[in-house]
Amino acid sequence: MILLISDLHLQEERPDISRAFLDLLDGRARHAKALYILGDFFEAWIGDDAMTPFQQSICQAMRRLSDSGTAIYLMHGNRDFLIGQAFCKAAGCTLLNDPSVIELGGEQVLLMHGDTLCTRDLGYMKMRRLLRNPLSLWILRHLPLSARYKLARKLRSESRTQVRMKSTEIVDVTPEEVPKVMAAHGVRTLVHGHTHRPAIHKLMVDGQPARRIVLGDWDRRGWALQVDEQGFQLAPFEFS
């Protein structure tokens, strides 16, 4: 069994989500061969050198799962792209490139966070290119902690404002981009998060039937994609 989740947006202000994640680690994930976390794991991450006690507790729980034999793979999201190798080493997880192609359920599957598919959101794409270039990443990681906290608060506030102002079409994936990206990677299944619109979409890629599986965000309930001998099963679950 393989589990895939995304968009937990872990933060101290939402202990219900944190408890649900810890329950997953102590429960279903213990029986999984691997757990994939496809971005926006944390609501914000300003650097491995600034871990709070809350974030350290999550890291330690992940390490316990890793030590028990479940492999953990973590992909950057737009909220936590400063997660680095120091955190991953402590948590016992592997940092996964976005995009990545893995073998899943007997086929090659493309994994993405999903934000790069939203090409109609020109303002976001411009900001993403600015923040993700190597020079910007170096500068961000070497800013004083106070400056990083201030910048993170500013970006989160602006992001919430922009999402409210933009149409749903702009902040969703660009329909034409999806088959193009899938064809470029030679896959018929894509799994991503980011949009908070869980669903399984059918489409055609190079004249062949294909599917796009969108993971759900964790808010009022959690979401997980389970891949086993029964196939690909996307389903929500209630927080205990």
UniProtKB/Swiss-Prot annotation:
Q: Which sites bind Mn(2+) 2?
A: D40, N78, H113, H194
Q: Name one GO molecular function term.
A: manganese ion binding
CDD domains, per the entry:
MPP_YbbF-LpxH
What SUPFAM superfamilies does the record tag this protein with? Metallo-dependent phosphatases (SSF56300)
Q: Which family does it belong to?
A: Belongs to the LpxH family.
Keywords, sorted A to Z:
Cell inner membrane, Cell membrane, Hydrolase, Lipid A biosynthesis, Lipid biosynthesis, Lipid metabolism, Manganese, Membrane, Metal-binding
Q: Where do the annotations place Mn(2+) 1 binding?
A: D7, H9, D40, H196
Q: Which GO terms describe its biological process?
A: lipid A biosynthetic process
**GO CC, alphabetical:** cytoplasm; extrinsic component of plasma membrane
Enumerate the cofactors the protein uses.
Mn(2+)
Question: Carries keyword Nucleotide-binding?
Answer: no
Its annotated pathway reads: Glycolipid biosynthesis; lipid IV(A) biosynthesis; lipid IV(A) from (3R)-3-hydroxytetradecanoyl-[acyl-carrier-protein] and UDP-N-acetyl-alpha-D-glucosamine: step 4/6
Protein's cellular compartments: Cell inner membrane
**Where does this protein chiefly localize?**
membrane
Summarizing the function annotation, the protein's role is: Hydrolyzes the pyrophosphate bond of UDP-2,3-diacylglucosamine to yield 2,3-diacylglucosamine 1-phosphate (lipid X) and UMP by catalyzing the attack of water at the alpha-P atom. Involved in the biosynthesis of lipid A, a phosphorylated glycolipid that anchors the lipopolysaccharide to the outer membrane of the cell.
Quick check: keyword Membrane in the entry?
yes
The protein in question is named UDP-2,3-diacylglucosamine hydrolase
| Binding residue positions for substrate | N78, R79, D121, S159, K166, H194
Topology in the lipid bilayer:
Peripheral membrane protein
Enzyme class at the top of the EC tree: hydrolase
